[in-house]
Amino acid sequence: MDFKQEVLDVLAEVCQDDIVKENPDIEIFEEGLLDSFGTVELLLAIENRFDILVPITEFDRDVWNTPNNIVNQLSELK
């Protein structure tokens, strides 16, 4: 399984919705798929699954707003 698919799987688990896989350009915050608690859960899941630490202070909703953008940000950090 490639990195993008793995990230989308984690995101779908946290959001409890497969739409993030079907439409990787969906605005996850605007659509109510992720909130502040979900953000923390996502960052912990990313750290546990990929061993990538993303400090909450580095998580900007305007940058991490779509599944594709999340994959891109994590690709830069890994």
Swiss-Prot record:
Gene Ontology MF annotations: D-alanyl carrier activity
Sites bearing O-(pantetheine 4'-phosphoryl)serine, chain numbering: 36
Pathway assigned in UniProt: Cell wall biogenesis; lipoteichoic acid biosynthesis
Record carries keyword DNA repair: no
The keyword Transit peptide is assigned to this record: no
UniProt cross-references to InterPro entries, sorted A to Z: ACP-like_sf (IPR036736), DltC (IPR003230), PP-bd_ACP (IPR009081)
Carrier domain sequence ranges: 1-78
Posttranslational mods: 4'-phosphopantetheine is transferred from CoA to a specific serine of apo-DCP.
Pfam families recorded: PP-binding (PF00550)
A GO biological process held by the record: lipoteichoic acid biosynthetic process
Compartments reported by the entry: Cytoplasm
UniProt KW keywords: Cell wall biogenesis/degradation, Cytoplasm, Phosphopantetheine, Phosphoprotein
A Gene Ontology term for the protein's cellular component: cytoplasm
Family annotation (NCBIfam families): dltC, PRK05087.1
Function: Carrier protein involved in the D-alanylation of lipoteichoic acid (LTA). The loading of thioester-linked D-alanine onto DltC is catalyzed by D-alanine--D-alanyl carrier protein ligase DltA. The DltC-carried D-alanyl group is further transferred to cell membrane phosphatidylglycerol (PG) by forming an ester bond, probably catalyzed by DltD. D-alanylation of LTA plays an important role in modulating the properties of the cell wall in Gram-positive bacteria, influencing the net charge of the cell wall.
Family that this chain belongs to: Belongs to the DltC family.
HAMAP family, alphabetized: DltC
Protein name as annotated: D-alanyl carrier protein
Chain's gene name: dltC
